[in-house]
Design a protein with these regions (language model features):
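FIC/Doc superfamily catalytic core
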Residues: 1-196
Length: 196
């Protein structure tokens, strides 16, 4: 049996119909999938950097960024999930929750509610908590946070300086920091975001 769809214990597995959305026939192992996704993410990041200065706090941009990041690998990239998960809001609530989050972030920016780092980290945390897509939510949310913090005049985050898709100490620190943010303690996630 292939390890293609084996997920870390703290990751959300794909549903069978979502697995069928794999576009790359050469992908047969988890290592292949990671390689294909990273190549697609790199292209999506380059596309996003070229769009600097444009409004990124729109639902269209949220979906388009995900499509640009994962569209060469998954047919459903850029489409909100339609299935339940062990994390995130109910699928029917995703559009409203994303719209509310973006409204909140625009308010925070306009009224200097938080400093730029905290504004971007709060965007990241809530986007992960909503979990709008079948897969790639953490990577997408980190990219959104990086783009926002840069738009607010700060350098992108280091996010622990590691590949957070692999099981390891840095991923555990990231998950623990997200769980602290779930309990309204943003300090560990802020620290992790700037750690190398």
């Amino acid at each position: 049996m292939s390890d293609l769809f084996d997920e870390p214990d703290d990751a959300t597995p794909l549903e069978p119909e979502e697995r069928d959305g794999l576009l790359q026939s050469w992908v047969t192992t988890r290592a292949d999938l990671n390689e294909a996704e990273q190549a697609s993410i790199d292209k999506g990041a380059a596309w996003a950097r070229r769009r600097r200065g444009r409004d990124m706090l729109s639902e269209d941009f949220v979906r388009l960024l995900h499509k640009r990041m994962f569209g060469e690998v998954w047919a459903w990239a850029g489409s909100y999930r339609r299935t339940g998960r062990n994390i995130g809001v109910g699928a029917c609530r995703i559009p409203a929750e994303v719209a509310q989050l973006l409204d909140d972030v625009r308010y925070w920016v306009e009224h200097d509610t938080y400093d730029p780092d905290e504004t971007a980290v709060r965007l990241h945390h809530r986007l992960v908590a909503i979990h709008p897509f079948p897969n790639g939510n953490g990577r997408h949310a980190r990219m959104m946070a990086d783009l926002l913090v840069q738009q607010l005049g700060r350098p992108p985050f280091a996010w622990g300086g590691a590949d957070l898709t692999d099981i390891g100490e840095k991923r555990r620190r990231y998950i623990n920091a997200l769980q602290s943010a779930d309990r309204h303690d943003m300090a560990p996630l802020l620290t992790f975001a700037r750690s190398a």
